[in-house]
């Protein structure tokens, strides 16, 4: 049985803790590997490697740091098929979806190729008599990232690319459910010219997370996962004096106005609701049609499309979606569907008993559609993280708008309409971080920042874009005056610009 270890000091190393976790093939339910779970001592080994390598890397000029990422982008493109297959084998998503996962991470690496410009400070000449003032950005030192299972390519690159480009060393703790791709990415970074010790990958469970959060040499932590764990990571990191950005759960709504192009909205809902089997923090899980006629037509058009979804293993290049990632995820999603029925929602399309011939033990759930869902129901409040779409009917625009505004989560939201006034009002008033206008999954591109509001985000700086440069650097402001500019002796009052 293959055992996946760690990546420390520029090479793969075997685990030494004696603790492991199984890595499953989601399509078959079979164990395909084990992954080592790091001890505190193994994390410290990674940190010591990072400490030794980081000062020289920070002193490397930004053009040379950028060249590593230019080469890394080239290698990602060269190895795209290999990377997608590694990802799909452990996660279960289709090959094309896996390529999209890697490509969105690649785009962040392209963005940080501009680090010579992005990390520039500010300068004020003549701030006072013969006084110049300037600010510089310097790396935090050692950063860490704790990433979820659902995007094992994109989200690690969200974190380590800007952190390393800014001159930091980095400790990555990926999900133990699909740990192979992050290690392969680390190997490619070394091939691209990154010095050993700058990027380390530690596999592990809560013990590894706690070791990261309490390690005195780690200065900043980035996290993506569920809201309860995001709160825990944020609070623990803060108590240990660390900068933290933590991103949690979501319940993303799409409002469909009566004037919307309904066919366009339906196609958007299919991709946004059922792509990646719904295991996306930006999946649309709630459709809010405005008016009974709009709702009836929407459900009528959605039903046959959901029933005809092609579901299969990653080796099926015609599959629309694959299995859920683990048996636990499968059981949880099935339980929430059952709960929705108990609460009185109408299950229009029931995919609970979907079985794929030859893959009967896989974690497949067919597409499901609930109608007549209300805000009091658990299936409305809870992030299901599966191929389940809930229809909540609204009688008018104001009622529709109030639904996502009152929800605990505030990650993403979308509106489909031909009315520019309604769209502008929506974008202005909604209390959610990422907004789509006739765009179903409003994930910002790499040069803008990604982040939600409310219980979807903890911390004041987002992922990628210019926020990422600010997060992974500290600002130092210098006020300089040379002797020829000193005209008077000691002063004992607060200096001001007279």
Which residue stretches match the model-derived regions?
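Rossmann-like NAD(P) dinucleotide-binding subdomain of oxidoreductase/dehydrogenase enzymes
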Residues: 121-267, 394, 459
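Hydrophobic face of amphipathic alpha-helices that form TPR/SEL1-like repeat modules
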Residues: 1-27, 352
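A structural signal for short, well-ordered beta-strand elements
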Residues: 22, 36, 58, 91, ...
């Amino acid at each position: 049985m293959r055992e996946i270890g760690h990546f420390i000091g520029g090479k793969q190393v075997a685990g030494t803790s004696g603790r492991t976790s199984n890595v499953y093939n989601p399509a078959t339910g079979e164990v395909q590997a084990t992954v080592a779970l790091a001890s505190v001592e193994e994390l410290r080994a990674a940190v010591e490697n990072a400490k030794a390598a980081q000062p020289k890397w920070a002193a490397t000029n930004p053009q040379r740091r950028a060249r590593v990422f230019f080469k890394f982008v080239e290698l990602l493109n060269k190895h795209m098929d290999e990377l997608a297959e590694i990802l799909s084998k452990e996660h279960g998503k289709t090959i094309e979806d896996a390529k999209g996962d890697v490509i969105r991470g690649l785009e962040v690496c392209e963005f940080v190729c501009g680090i010579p410009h992005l990390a520039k400070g500010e300068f004020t000449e003549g701030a006072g008599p013969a006084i110049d003032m300037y600010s510089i950005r310097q790396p935090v030192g050692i950063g860490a990232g704790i990433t979820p299972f659902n995007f094992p390519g994109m989200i690690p690159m969200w974190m380590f690319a800007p952190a390393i480009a800014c001159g930091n060393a980095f400790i990555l703790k990926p999900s133990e459910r699909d740990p192979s791709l992050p290690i392969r990415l680390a190997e490619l970074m070394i091939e691209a010219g990154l010095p050993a010790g700058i990027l380390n990958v530690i596999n592990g469970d809560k013990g590894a997370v706690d070791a990261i959060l309490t390690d005195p040499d780690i200065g900043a932590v980035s996290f993506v996962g569920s809201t309860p764990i995001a709160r825990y990571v944020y609070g623990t990191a803060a108590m240990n004096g660390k900068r933290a950005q933590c991103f949690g759960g979501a319940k993303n709504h799409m409002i469909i106005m009566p004037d919307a192009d309904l066919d366009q909205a339906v196609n958007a809902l299919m991709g946004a609701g059922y792509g990646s089997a719904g295991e996306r923090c930006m999946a649309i899980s709630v459709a809010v049609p405005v008016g009974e006629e709009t709702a009836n037509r929407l459900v009528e058009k959605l039903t046959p499309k959901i029933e005809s979804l092609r579901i299969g293993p990653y080796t099926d290049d015609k599959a629309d979606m694959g299995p859920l990632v683990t048996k636990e995820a499968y059981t949880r999603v099935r339980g929430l569907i059952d709960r929705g029925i108990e609460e009185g929602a109408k299950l229009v399309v029931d995919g609970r008993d979907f079985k794929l011939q030859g893959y009967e033990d896989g974690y497949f759930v067919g597409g499901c559609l609930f109608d007549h869902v209300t805000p009091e129901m658990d299936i409305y409040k809870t992030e299901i993280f599966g191929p389940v779409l809930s229809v909540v009917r609204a009688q008018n625009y104001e009622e529709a708008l109030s639904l996502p505004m009152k929800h605990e989560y505030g990650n993403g939201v979308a509106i489909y309409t031909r009315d520019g006034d309604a769209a502008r009002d929506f974008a202005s008033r909604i209390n959610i971080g990422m907004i789509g206008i006739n765009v179903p999954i409003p994930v910002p591109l790499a040069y803008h920042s990604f982040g939600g509001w409310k219980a979807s985000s903890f911390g004041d700086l987002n992922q990628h874009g210019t926020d990422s440069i600010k997060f992974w650097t500290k600002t130092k402001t210098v006020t300089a005056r040379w002797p020829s500019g000193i005209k008077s002796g000691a002063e004992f009052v607060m200096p001001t610009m007279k």
